Amino acid sequence: AGQLAAQVTYRLDDEDRLDIIFSGVSTENTLFNPMTHVYFNLVGKDQDISQHKLQIASRKHLEVDNHMIPTGNMIDNQNTKFDFAHLHALGQEHYDDAWVLGLSRQGEGLKLTSPDESLTLTVDSDRNGVVVFTANPDDNSAIKTALAIEMQTLPDAVNHEDFGDIVLPANETKTYTVTYQIKKSEDK
């Protein structure tokens, strides 16, 4: 079965940038796709996030079957509910989906702002995907109060060759980094 030694390091700098660094080494070949499941609401606890504005450096998202398992197809985002190429409000849509991140994203894989844009969260990683999950209440009339942002190698990569490599070979170390930064606008 082997032994996996995993380490998580948190590093905060003077620019209010938080790096989370995941490292792993195993005595046998295994899978390694660590991520965080952190929820954000930039206007306050229990407040509606539908007017938060989102931008994702992505042109494609993963198609899933009726069990939420990726089919292997990457679908164009343009002119769909998945099109966050430009900053715009989340709206009432429910999300529990994976976006394929572009390679030239210049430190902003994802940007989330408060409705008045007084606060901006940027998230980036050396990973090729991001899962965005609106805390989808069972009651469709209930408000969504948080957004989870999970930077990771694309889900189900072990079954889809072009989704990325999550195999951790025996006695090799893999390291991944996710960076979060919140900025307050001086103009708002």
Q: Where are the predicted features?
A:
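An exposed, glycine/acidic-rich loop-and-rim segment of catalytic or binding clefts
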Residues: 1-188
